[in-house]
Amino acid sequence: AASMAACGARANVAVVSGGSVPKLYMNARDHVKKDVKALENCIGSFALLITPDDGQTPVIRLDSLGKHTVGAGAAPQAITSALTFEPLQKAGLKMTDVDKYAPELHNAEITLPAGAGNVPEANYKMIAALSVMKGQIERADIPKFVAERGMPGFVPTQGHIPSGVPYIGHALEALKAGTIKRAMIIGKGSLFLGRLTNLADGASFIMEGPGAGTEPAQGVSQSDVTEMLLAALSDVAANLQKG
């Protein structure tokens, strides 16, 4: 969607997604066993409007998109590296240059009683551990990294709704207000794909404030071109005389 808007193929692109009815009360059996109320009683959905860069709205960087390729492997460390470290490295950024990471933002109140753990916290710890491996933070700074660059999970467990996408609205407000400079939105994992192929899918992108990471174009005047041509011709003439 962002690529179509950026290249001018489409002026406005709407990205709309809804939850899955069959996944209502998906973990209810475990909740009931533990005498916990079945909380999965809502369907999550979201919609985004992608437009060309107007210089005033936060942007999606298209030069550093993350993707989980088949060759990356299915190990959690490999997936995390493909979706965070590699695209940041491509953009010349460090893991600490991202103010907020938004991975799978499952609501822990639902997943903990179901035995799935605190999914967002596990993701943040993995990202922090990868930062330690790359020498970008110290091991003792892992809790601080998680606290400052993470967030509690708040999203219904509805298919791919609990990715990082629901944070986009909050990120837009924070980027406009200047409270953060950069956020990374991460989506990964597919239960059905994983069951069928033992592989996972994933993608990520970086959001930045208006004008961030861009430099004004340097205009070249006619006189500049003339001077460069004259200098080049002088060099050619000098070489011919030497010959």
Model-derived segments and spans:
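Active-site-adjacent helical/loop segments in soluble small-molecule enzymes
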Residues: 146-155, 159-163
